[in-house]
Amino acid sequence: MTQAALAMSMTDPIDTTADAGLMARIDSACQRIAPLWPLKHFVAVNPFLGFTGQSFAATAATFERVVRTRMLMPRAFYRQALDDGRIDDAALAQALGAHPSTGLELNELKQKARAEAGTSSPPAVVATVAEVLDRLAEGDRYVSLVAFMIDEISAFCATYFDEGQASWPSPVRKLKPYAAWRTIAAYDRNPEVMGLTGFRKAIAELPADPVQAIGVIVDRLGIPERAVEDYLVRALFDLGGWSAYARYIGWSAGLDGQRDDTLLELLAIRLAWGYALYQARTDDAFKAAWAQAMAEAAKLPADQRLEETPELAIDLVLHEAYEIALRSKLVARLAGHGAQAVTRLPARPPVQAAFCIDVRSEIFRRALETAYPDAETIGFAGFFGFPIEYVPIGHSKGGAQCPVLLKPAFIVCEAVKDADDVEQSEVLGLRLLRRRAAKALKSFKVSAVSSFSFVETAGLGFAAKIATDSAGVTRPVPSPVVDGLDPEIAARVQPRLTPGELAGRATGFTDPQRVAMAEAVLKAMSLTGPFARLVLLAGHGSTTVNNPHASGLDCGACGGHTGEANARVAAAVLNDWQVREGLRAKGIDIPADCWFIGALHDTTTDDVTLFDEDDVPATLAQDLARLKARLTEAARLARLERSALLGISNKAAVDEAVIARSRDWSQVRPEWGLAGNTAFIAAPRSFTRGLNLGGRAFLHSYEAARDDGHRTLELIMTAPMVVASWINLQYYGSTVNNAAFGSGNKVLHNIVGQLGVLEGNAGDLRVGLPWQSVHDGSRLIHEPVRLNVFIAAPEAAMDEIMQRHQGVRDLVVNGWVMLHSLSDQGTIRRCVRPGEWRSA
């Protein structure tokens, strides 16, 4: 490693002054990539996030032309829907009306739908050097240069970005990515073994600055001016997984008000590989093929006209018709239900139970309302309005317990209830000691020197553990929540709200902050009175084993963590008598006999755990006992409803079977997560109570009459609605094209760097959901449709919010979500654009 390379620190700025135009194209290309959160807090992300500024149809054309991949189902899927009657003539006619540029008549469309899709490519596409070389290759022993390049870059990224899985850290970790890769490339002979002569020389000739290197490569490859940005986008999507992770690093830096160029540097690495391949081939055949590819790229259309890709246009219309047919049924059910009489609750219900808006909560809320008819259920984002960083005992930093669109505003540390300073120190010291011992044992097990001798000498000692893990009696890996803590101590752990300090950072809440947060949360929940005697705040999480994507089943509103911390913090704040005094001065009067209690809904087993029961006043003991009994009954009803999709045929043994799935380390489908999501409804519960939405709708409580200035409506449309669209589109992408937007076969997953998975032992980092999350082995469980949003609010207010927030406007106008207004009379109208609403 050279001294010059070592001198280039991680904080050295990138020179962006050489070519402002090129830098603008680079930034634009990088913005096209959606971020990928690491496994420890894996959250759903819209894979088309960088394309929402253009229409859904235009994006489909862009992906076919630039990325060379589809974002629609195969033609056979829509043909089957026609045969099954799920798409009717009315839906086809309406879809054709939305795409007049196709020039198709109804009968002509039906004929084409029943024919196999043509294989013709778009009129102009973007090709890379490696792709052109692969086209020229002959013989069955040829190794794809595209695959080889991706494997090599992926291997570098796995070592460079490793978050603690590797025993030996990368020696160039302190350098920026491009400098680190060039340092290693100077010694790497793998490319030359593959026949890429002069690889190291070509890389050494490139500028050390990544932006300058990109400029040189673009110039020497002769990429047409019109195609430069598309070429950069294509290069990034060649490494879609690692590009997405690099984008996450930049996203996180952006929340802190900083700029990070990791993705730009990865782009430079990818282009440098292409440049080295280009330099290695000087034969006439390649020169002619490359010239032809660049001539095609120069003809790229300035827009994405559907008539230029007729086969895509047909599939877009068929997909639109498929969605219209499904949406029509949903609209009819909502409109019909809204006109029915709704069972009235007591003026003061005995229990108010707030759950996350997650679609899995819809099933449990219906079950609880069946088991406890007088109870009122509420839907709200599962972080309960408290954007906190929750720091466990023994840690200096914690996870962000809030939507990834936000940055934590408060730091809350974990503490042991009723423990003095001496006991707190003992617990901390013991947990740190156990963590160090576990780390040392792991290092010994995987060490190159001791791994074989360890297995030979201690292998039999693990036989009992393997047996109990296989039987579901014990967990293969301890829960990180209680890892290193004695059971008695783990039962006493709780969040500490009092102000303090951690490594120079303020923790806890001041009294004014508690009052302000409590007021904001209650108003956002439309919960300002009357209050029940017991108010349940139920976050949610999941229980699975041997599941790399386990955090993806936890609460997305809590940043891929369980909602326990947020529920307990919110309940503790709202039970504070000083907070209640402050709220009373603001017009919110919480009665003295009202108590908030935090809880956690396990979406895998449907069990509900209540926290801090010892703090509940004795006068509410009977109320609490009644609630626990009703929750147990609701859990049984919810498991019974979910058992059909889980394939549990023995209804008498549903409870045991569901719990067994949560402990089975060979189970690839412990639960269905948010598969099937189709709708987001923000309205009073009276609009949907008694309506079976099949666990397919996000339900957010909202009462426009209580929303002065429509501030809560603005929060709903800019946060929960956007997050719901991210979830919906991740499931959509993982269903329509799992190879591009999903993570493939879960059985083949290998964790890399503790941050993501590979499918097998090589290739790109995988994004999105495993195939098993959307398909049961014989049929799709998730229907690939865009999110239908229904909000019971004035249309003019929604228009104003869309005008103020371009991101929300883009989602609606460009067809990424279908926004509807709901009225008390059951009238439903769809928004075409701000100011234009049509009957649905």
From Swiss-Prot:
Required cofactor(s): Zn(2+)
KW Cell inner membrane (keyword) present: yes
Signal peptide: none
GO molecular function terms attached to this record: zinc ion binding
UniProt-listed InterPro entries: DabA (IPR018752)
Compartments (UniProt record): Cell inner membrane
GO CC annotations, alphabetized: plasma membrane
Keywords: Cell inner membrane, Cell membrane, Membrane, Metal-binding, Transport, Zinc
Binding sites annotated in the UniProt record for Zn(2+): 356, 358, 540, 555
Membrane topology: Peripheral membrane protein
Predominant subcellular localization, coarse grouping: membrane
Source domain of life: Bacteria
HAMAP family the UniProt entry points to: DabA
Sequence similarity: Belongs to the inorganic carbon transporter (TC 9.A.2) DabA family.
Protein name as catalogued: Probable inorganic carbon transporter subunit DabA 2
Species this protein is from: Bradyrhizobium sp. (strain ORS 278)
